[in-house]
Curated annotation (Swiss-Prot):
It comes from Chromobacterium violaceum (strain ATCC 12472 / DSM 30191 / JCM 1249 / CCUG 213 / NBRC 12614 / NCIMB 9131 / NCTC 9757 / MK). This is Valine--tRNA ligase. The keyword Ribosomal protein does not apply. The lineage of its organism: Bacteria, Pseudomonadati, Pseudomonadota, Betaproteobacteria, Neisseriales. A motif ('HIGH' region) lies at residues 45-55. It comes from the Bacteria. InterPro entries: aa-tRNA-synth_I_CS (IPR001412), aa-tRNA-synth_Ia (IPR002300), Anticodon_Ia_Val (IPR033705), M/V/L/I-tRNA-synth_anticd-bd (IPR013155), Rossmann-like_a/b/a_fold (IPR014729), tRNA-bd_arm (IPR010978), tRNAsynth_Ia_anticodon-bd (IPR009080), Val-tRNA_synth_C_sf (IPR037118). Residues 876-939 form a coiled coil. Pfam families: Anticodon_1, tRNA-synt_1, Val_tRNA-synt_C.
C-alpha cells in the first residue's frame, strides 16, 4: 500500500485532487430522476473581481452543502457563473484607458464595449481559478456569464413580456445621480458617511407683511428649486401662516407655506424648505401636495441658466430663468456665491457647524445628487395585463414568504424582507452606461416607443418610420434577478428546469436581501409560477480581527488565496497599498500591515481556511476573522494526518477484521468510541441539515481531536500490544473503521485532506466502494451501537486518569518519572483500567487493595475509589521546592490583594475584570493551602 507522506503539505495535494475530480466529471449532476434533487445557486461574483473573504465564507457553506447532499445520493447541481457588473467593470476599463490618454467618448460605444469584452476574457478567469482553489464542486460545463448570448436572450424576452404586460414604463423620476459616471445608480451603490458640514439659517419674508420665517438648511444651493416651505400640522406656533406666500430669496418668486406630517416641529427652526426635484423626501411631500418639480441642475451637477419645470406625471411645464450669476457653477461654487449674496441682502441669519450624512458613490466618491431624469421602471404594485392571479409582482413575492414557500434562516430576516416589500417603490432598471444589456426599445422621430426582441420586430411595429435605439442599458440586478431560471433553459421546458427549479437554498449575506433575493423571488414567481429557492440562509459579514468592515480603502482586505498559499510581507504591503482611492492612506496601511503580519501570512491550506469559515458560520451574526483560529485548524489537519499515519503503521498488512467470520472481542474502549461515532454522525447530519456549520465543525473537531486521537488512539496502543488475537483484531478494525467514517463526516468541510487519507484508509475498512470519497455514501448512525454502559465506564476511567495526573502534579512528579499506584476499591472491574492507566498516567504498576497503606502521601478520590501514588521522595529537596513555590504564590497573592484593596478599584473597574481577579485570588489561596498541607506532611 502506498505510504502516506511524513508531513501534511496541502498545496500539491489540493491541486492534484481538484484536477482529478473535475476531469472525472464528479461535479456534474447524476440526472437520476428517481433520486431527490439538490440544487444551489451561486451569487455570481463580479467578473472584474477577485475572491474576498466574504466569497470564501459563503462558498465554503455552499460547497459544504453540495458535497453533503451529493454523498446522501441526491441528484446534485451547483451552477457557477459571473456577473457582468455594469458600473464596476466600466469604471475599471475606463481607468485603464485613461492611463493611455483615451476616453470612451473619443472611442465610441462599439470600440469601447469591444475593449471591455477583451478585458473580460483576460481577467474573467481570476475568480473562477480562485473558486477552484477554495474547492468549489460546481458543474463547470454549465458556467454562465450574465451577458452571454443565452442570458441576453432571456433578458430580452423578460423585458419584452413585462412591457407587453404593462409592467415596464419610461418616466421622469428622481434618481441617485453620479455626475462623474453620468448615470443613475442604485441605493446599494450609495454610501452615506457622517461628515462635518454647516446648517444655514435663511430668512424667507412673508409677502405683504413684515413677518418672516427662518428656514434651516444644509443645502442652500438647491433653494433655487424650492416650491414651498412646510411646517408640522400640529405646530401651533406657525399654523396661522399656512396658505400664506413667502418671497423665495434670490429668485423673485413666491412660494406657499404648507403643513405636512414629514416635518418634525422639534427639529431645527420648525420650517423645512421643500425642493421636490432635488430631495427624495421632498419629492414625496411635493407629490402629496400637487406641487411642481423645478429642476435647477444639469446632468453634470451644474446650475442651469433656465430651470426646467415638470409635473409629477413627467409632463414638461415650461422653464424659468435663474440668476445669471450662478449659471454653470458646480453645487459647491453656487453655494459659496449664493451665501455671499444672502449675506449681502441681510437674509443669512446664522451659520452653525453641523454633522450630516453625505451620500457618495461607492466607486467614485462623488457626492450623489438626487436628480430628475428619464428612466425605465418596472411597476411593482400593478397587476400585469391578463394575469389570472390578480396579484402584482410584489404581492406574489410577499405571499411566497408569508405562506412559507420561501423560508428565511434565521427567520428574523422575514421582518426586514416584509418591511421593504410592503413599502416597495417601482424599480428603476435603466443605467446611462455603455456596458450592460442594451434596452430593447426604439424611438421614432416623435418620441414614440417600440419594444421588440429584435430591431426587425420593433420596425414591424413602427411601419416604415426611421427608428433609433435606446442608448441606456439595464441595471445589473435585472439580469441577476433572472439567474434561477435563465441558467436552466427557460423559456423552454427543459429537464434541468424540471429537476432543479425550485432550488433548495440560497446562501447569501444580508446586504443584498432587497437588491437580489427579493427580485429573484419576484421575477421567478412571476415567470414560472414557482419560487426560486425553498430556503434563504443569511450569514453574517466577515470583518477584520478588530471588527471593522474589510475594504480596500481601509487596507484591511485579506485575499483568501493568500491564506491558502501564504504571502511574504513585501508583496502583501504592495497589494494592500496599490489602487487606493485615497493614496495618502498608504503609509498608515503599510505600518498597520507590518505590525499585524511582521513575517507575512503563513500558508494554512484550503482545508484549514474552510474549517475556519465553517466554525464561524453561526446564524446571521457578523464574525471577526482571527488568524489564530486558522492556525489552530491547520494544526488540526496535522493532527488528523499524523493520527492516520500512526493507524496505518499499526494496521497495514495486519488483520483488520475484513473477514466478518473471524471472532472479534470489543473492549469497553472500542464500544465507547463506536458509540461516540454514532452520536457524532447524528449531530453532524442534524447540523448540516439546519445550516449550523459552526456546530458541525465543533462536533467533528471534538470527536477527531479529543475523543479519537487523544483518547482512543492512545488506548488502542495498549490493546494492540496486549490482548488476544480476537481483541487485537477488534481494535484494528475499530481504528480503521471509525477513522474511515470520520473522514466521510469531515469531507464536506475539509474535502482535500479527507480524500487523500480516505484513499489509504478505506480499503482496510472494506469501504472502498467508490472511486472517490466525494461519491462515497454519507454515514448513517446506528443508535443500537451507542452503549450507555461503555460510556459510563469510559467516563469513570477518564476521571481516574485525571485524578492520577492531578496527584502527580500536586506531588511534583515529573513526566519522566514512573510511579506505582494503589487503588482502594471494592469494584474488581477497575482492574480492567490498570493497563491503560499505566500508559496514560505514567505508572510502573497499578494495584487494587482493600485499604491504602498507612502513609503521609496525598490521596485522591475517583468515584468511590481512593488513589495513592507510592513514591520515595527526597524530603529535603521536595521541602526546598515547595518553600520556593510557597514564596512565589505568596508574592502573587500580596500583589493581587493590594490591587483589590486599592480605593475605588472594585467600584470603578469593569465587572468582568474584578470577577477575574477575585477568582484568581481564590485559586491562589487554594494553591497555598495545598502547599502548606504538603509541607506539614513532609515535616
Amino acid at each position: 500500500m502506498e505510504q502516506l507522506a511524513k508531513s501534511y503539505e496541502p498545496g500539491d495535494l489540493e491541486r492534484r485532487w481538484y484536477q482529478h475530480w473535475e476531469q472525472a466529471g464528479y461535479f456534474k449532476p447524476s440526472m437520476d430522476t428517481s433520486k431527490p434533487s439538490f440544487a444551489i445557486q451561486l451569487p455570481p461574483p463580479n467578473v472584474t473581481g477577485t475572491l474576498h473573504m466574504g466569497h470564501a465564507f459563503n462558498q465554503t457553506i455552499m460547497d459544504g452543502l453540495t458535497r453533503f447532499y451529493r454523498m446522501k445520493g441526491h441528484n446534485t447541481l451547483w451552477v457557477p457563473g459571473t456577473d457582468h457588473a455594469g458600473i464596476a467593470t466600466q469604471i475599471v476599463v475606463e481607468r485603464q484607458l485613461a492611463d493611455q490618454g483615451l476616453n470612451r467618448h473619443d472611442m465610441g460605444r462599439e470600440a469601447f464595449t469591444s475593449k471591455i469584452w477583451e478585458w473580460k476574457e483576460k481577467s474573467g478567469g481570476t475568480i473562477t481559478s480562485q473558486m477552484r482553489r477554495v474547492g468549489c464542486s460546481v458543474d463547470w460545463d454549465r458556467e454562465y456569464f450574465t451577458m452571454d448570448d443565452v442570458r441576453a436572450e432571456v433578458v430580452t424576452e423578460v423585458f419584452v413580456r413585462l412591457y407587453e404586460q404593462g409592467l415596464i414604463y419610461r418616466g421622469k423620476r428622481l434618481s441617485n445621480w453620479d455626475a462623474k459616471l453620468g448615470t443613475a445608480i442604485s441605493d446599494l451603490e450609495v454610501v452615506s458617511e457622517e461628515e462635518d458640514g454647516h446648517m444655514w439659517h435663511i430668512k424667507y419674508p412673508v409677502v405683504g407683511s413684515d413677518e418672516f420665517v427662518t428656514v434651516a438648511t444644509t443645502r442652500p444651493e438647491t433653494l433655487l428649486g424650492d416650491v414651498a416651505v412646510a411646517i408640522a400640522p400640529d405646530d401651533e406656533r406657525y399654523l396661522h401662516l399656512v396658505g400664506k406666500q413667502l418671497e423665495l430669496p434670490l429668485t423673485g418668486r413666491t412660494i406657499p407655506v404648507i403643513a405636512d406630517s414629514y416635518v418634525d416641529k422639534e427639529f431645527g427652526t420648525g420650517f423645512v424648505k421643500i425642493t421636490p426635484a432635488h430631495d427624495f423626501n421632498d419629492y414625496e411631500v411635493g407629490k402629496r401636495h400637487g406641487t411642481q418639480l423645478i429642476n435647477v441642475m444639469s446632468l453634470e451637477a451644474k446650475i442651469l441658466a433656465k430651470a426646467q419645470i415638470f409635473g409629477f406625471d413627467g409632463s414638461a411645464q415650461g422653464a424659468i430663468e435663474l440668476p445669471a450669476a450662478y449659471a454653470g457653477l458646480t453645487a459647491q461654487e453656487a453655494r459659496k456665491a449664493m451665501l455671499a449674496d444672502l449675506q449681502a441682502q441681510g437674509l443669512l441669519l446664522e451659520t452653525k457647524p453641523h454633522k450630516l450624512m453625505v451620500p457618495r458613490g461607492d466607486r467614485t466618491g462623488t457626492v450623489i445628487e438626487p436628480l430628475l431624469t428619464d428612466q425605465w421602471f418596472v411597476a411593482m404594485n400593478k397587476v400585469a395585463e391578463g394575469d389570472a392571479t390578480g396579484q402584482s409582482i410584489a404581492a406574489k413575492a410577499i405571499e411566497a414568504v408569508e405562506s412559507g414557500e420561501v423560508r428565511f434562516v434565521p427567520e428574523n430576516w422575514v421582518n426586514t424582507y416584509n418591511q421593504w416589500m410592503k413599502n416597495i417603490q417601482d424599480w428603476c432598471i435603466s443605467r446611462q452606461l455603455w456596458w450592460g444589456h442594451q434596452i430593447p426599445a426604439w424611438y421614432d422621430e416623435d418620441g414614440n416607443i417600440y419594444v421588440g426582441r429584435t430591431e426587425a420586430e420593433a420596425q414591424a411595429k413602427a411601419g416604415g418610420k426611421t427608428l433609433r435605439r435606446e442608448q441606456d442599458v439595464l441595471d445589473t440586478w435585472f439580469s441577476s434577478a433572472l439567474v434561477p431560471f435563465s441558467t436552466l433553459g427557460w423559456p423552454e421546458e427543459t429537464p434541468d428546469l424540471k429537476a432543479f427549479l425550485t432550488s433548495n437554498v440560497l446562501v447569501t449575506g444580508y446586504e443584498i436581501i432587497f437588491f437580489w433575493v427579493a427580485r429573484m423571488i419576484m421575477m421567478t414567481k412571476h415567470f414560472t409560477g414557482k419560487v426560486p429557492f425553498k430556503d434563504v440562509y443569511i450569514h453574517g459579514m466577515v470583518r477584520d480581527h478588530e471588527g471593522k468592515k474589510m475594504s480596500k480603502s481601509e487596507g484591511n482586505v485579506i485575499d483568501p488565496v493568500d491564506l491558502i498559499d501564504g504571502i511574504a510581507l513585501e508583496p502583501l504591503v504592495e497589494k494592500r497599498t496599490t489602487g487606493l482611492r485615497r493614496p495618502e492612506k498608504a503609509p498608515q496601511i503599510a505600518k498597520a500591515t507590518e505590525k499585524l503580519f511582521p513575517e507575512g501570512i503563513p500558508a494554512y491550506g484550503t482545508d484549514a481556511l474552510r474549517f475556519t469559515m465553517a466554525s464561524y458560520a453561526t446564524l446571521g451574526r457578523s464574525v471577526n476573522f482571527d488568524f489564530k483560529r486558522a492556525e489552530g485548524y491547520r494544526n488540526f489537519c496535522n493532527k488528523l494526518w499524523n493520527a492516520t499515519r500512526f493507524v496505518m503503521m499499526n494496521v497495514d498488512g495486519k488483520d483488520c477484521g475484513q473477514d466478518e467470520s473471524l471472532p472479534l472481542e470489543y473492549s469497553f474502549v472500542d464500544q465507547w468510541i463506536i458509540g461516540r461515532l454514532q452520536q457524532a454522525e447524528i449531530d453532524v447530519t442534524n447540523a448540516l441539515e439546519t445550516y449550523r456549520f459552526d456546530i458541525a465543525a465543533q462536533v467533528i473537531y471534538e470527536f477527531i481531536w479529543n475523543e479519537y486521537c487523544d483518547w482512543y488512539v492512545e488506548l488502542a496502543k495498549v490493546q494492540i500490544q496486549g490482548g488476544n488475537e480476537a481483541q487485537q483484531r477488534a481494535t484494528r478494525r475499530t481504528l480503521v473503521r471509525v477513522l474511515e467514517v470520520a473522514l466521510r463526516l469531515n469531507h464536506p468541510l475539509m474535502p482535500f485532506i479527507t480524500e487523500e487519507l480516505w484513499q489509504t484508509v478505506a480499503p482496510l475498512a472494506n469501504a472502498k466502494k467508490t472511486e472517490s470519497l466525494m461519491l462515497a455514501p454519507w454515514p448513517v448512525a446506528d443508535e443500537s451501537k451507542i452503549s450507555a454502559a461503555a460510556n459510563a465506564r469510559m467516563e469513570a476511567f477518564k476521571d481516574m486518569v485525571n485524578a492520577v495526573r492531578n496527584l502527580r502534579g500536586e506531588m511534583g512528579i515529573g513526566p519522566a518519572v514512573k510511579a506505582p499506584l494503589f487503588i482502594e476499591t471494592a469494584d474488581a472491574s477497575i482492574a480492567d483500567f490498570v493497563p491503560y492507566l499505566k500508559l496514560l498516567a505514567r505508572l510502573t504498576e497499578g494495584t487494587l487493595v482493600a485499604k491504602l497503606p498507612e502513609d503521609d502521601a496525598p490521596v485522591a478520590m475517583s468515584g468511590e475509589a481512593r488513589l495513592m501514588l507510592k513514591v520515595e521522595v527526597d524530603k529535603a529537596a521536595e521541602t526546598a521546592r515547595l518553600r520556593k513555590e510557597q514564596g512565589k504564590v505568596e508574592a502573587e497573592l500580596a500583589k493581587l490583594t493590594a490591587k483589590l484593596e486599592k480605593p475605588g478599584y472594585v467600584d470603578k473597574a469593569p465587572a468582568h475584570l474584578v470577577e477575574r481577579d477575585k477568582a484568581q485570588l481564590a485559586e491562589l489561596n487554594d494553591k497555598l493551602e495545598k502547599i502548606r498541607v504538603q509541607l506539614v506532611k513532609l515535616a
